Amino acid sequence: HSLGTVNRVMQELTELQYVTEGEITGAGISALEPYRAKRAIFIAAGFGSRLVPITFNTPKPLVRVHGQRIIDGLIDACLDAGINEIYIVRGYLAEQFDQLLYKYPMIRFLENPVYNEANNISSAMVARYMLSNAYVFEADLLISNPQIIKKYHYTSDFLAIKKDRTDDWCFTVKDGVIVEEKVGGLDCWQMVGISYWNEEDGHKLSDDIKMTYEQPGGKERYWEQVPLVFCQKHYKV
């Protein structure tokens, strides 16, 4: 932004008493509260077939890479961003996730009893009432830059990587909004399994996930297909 724009905005914020001498005030922090990320949900119920035979005995998020469990990096990034309300949806070898409580006693577990009968929409069903002001993570992601997890969000969004070509799940984006989700594409954005949902969209997702899940074939869906495909008109992500 231009210096003139920055100065004008700072003047407006000062007049509103949100900023004083370049520092945010208590009133400013209160004004930001509706946009604060309040919780994180980790989808961790699946088998992790791509890491067989390691996952025969260990859920994929608990596999250690360079001595650290995969999920630890994600949880630490959330805590660093001030997100302390953390839910883990577990299913396969569920009891093994109890070990996380020694390091992260704030964790709450959500049980997915049908993880081996349905796709990951079944995990979203279990967590559907926690989706407002919430991050949703695939729990088996390694991140190199924890600062990608932000404390404040003004809209719902998906994290993605710009690609000239990919064979993976990706988005087509038009005017900053996802208009298509597909497998493989050119000049697209590759999904990375991290999204954020504001309060309004989180409430809509709660209803739309349930509706989609209960339709014929609904249990075979991926949860993110709900806002991006089946109920796309309800969202602007």
Regions found by a protein language model. Name each.
Residues 61, 106-108, 236:
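Conserved beta-strand segments of alpha/beta enzyme cores
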Residues 145-217:
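Conserved core of the sugar-phosphate nucleotidyltransferase
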Residues 98-169:
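Conserved beta-loop-beta/alpha segment of the NTase-like Rossmann-fold superfamily
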Residues 14-23:
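A short, conserved structural fragment
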Residues 50, 73, 96-99, 126, ...:
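Phosphate- and divalent-cation-binding pockets in alpha/beta enzyme and binding domains
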Residues 30-90, 94-97:
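N-terminal glycine-rich phosphate-binding loop and ensuing alpha1 helix
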Residues 23, 29-40, 190-237:
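Conserved alpha/beta core of the MobA/IspD/sugar-nucleotide pyrophosphorylase nucleotidyltransferase superfamily
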Residues 2-12:
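Short amphipathic alpha-helical interaction segments
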